[in-house]
Amino acid sequence: MENVINVWEEYGLTRSWNNPKLDIQRKANTQKDLFFVGVFSNKIIATAMFGYDGHRGWLNYFAVLPQFQKSGFGKQLLEFGELLLVDKGCPKLNLQIRANNKEAINFYKAVGYNEDEVISFGKRLIED
């Protein structure tokens, strides 16, 4: 668990209002078959937390350690998750990116994702 969180922290995904250990535990209780890590030389270098609610797929905590970015690991992990979602009948995969994360925006555009004309809303139901 700590190795996964280290990837998230190094990539800058963790936030003070989200407890990453609780997020991992919650995912382990819900569609744990859609939570993946990428490993290179026995070290976790990438993570992806996919989900499917019967209408849309979602991707969270997608991260690749900086020293392994632009090497194809992220694309390979993303495509693997996409194939699993297609097998489950998922017609579309959605994800959210912080507006200032230009590298992620460029990555997703390069692998065929388009910006949707939507506004994202959220409401915290359980405090971490």
Identify the function of each model-found stretch.
Residues M1-Y61, L65, F80, L84, ...:
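Acetyl-CoA-dependent GNAT
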Residues W58-Y61, Q96, F107:
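Residue-level recognition of specific faces of alpha-helices
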Residues L65-S71, A99-N100:
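Active-site acidic-Proline motif in GNAT/NAT acetyltransferases
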Residues L95-A104, G122-E127:
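Conserved beta-strand-loop-alpha-helix junction that forms the acyl-donor binding cleft
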Residues N3, Q76, E103:
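Charged catalytic carboxylate motif
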Residues Y108, Y113:
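Conserved active-site tyrosine of GNAT-family acetyltransferases
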Residues F68, G72-F80:
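Conserved acetyl-CoA pyrophosphate-binding loop and the N-cap/start of the following alpha-helix
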